[in-house]
Amino acid sequence: MRIRYFAWIKDITNKDDDIIDINHPKTIQELKKYLENLYPELKKHFLQDVLRFAVNQEYVSENLNLQPIDEIAIFPPVSGG
């Protein structure tokens, strides 16, 4: 499973993406917990519920079951200019 990061999330992770094993996590909610362990600074953003998740280019709920071939993108809030 590929996890893609955008905007300031890349600054937190210091990378554009991660490849992880499907055995854990199985839902977006579990993915958030998994990523909190890898990148503790993300926890406050998850708690504020400001990040959006897309699976295979479609926005999804936290209860979606993930598959090994899924590509998950994590987006911060959009800011205008």
How should each PLM-predicted stretch be described?
Residues M1-S79:
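Ubiquitin-like/PB1-type beta-grasp interaction modules and other compact soluble beta-rich domains
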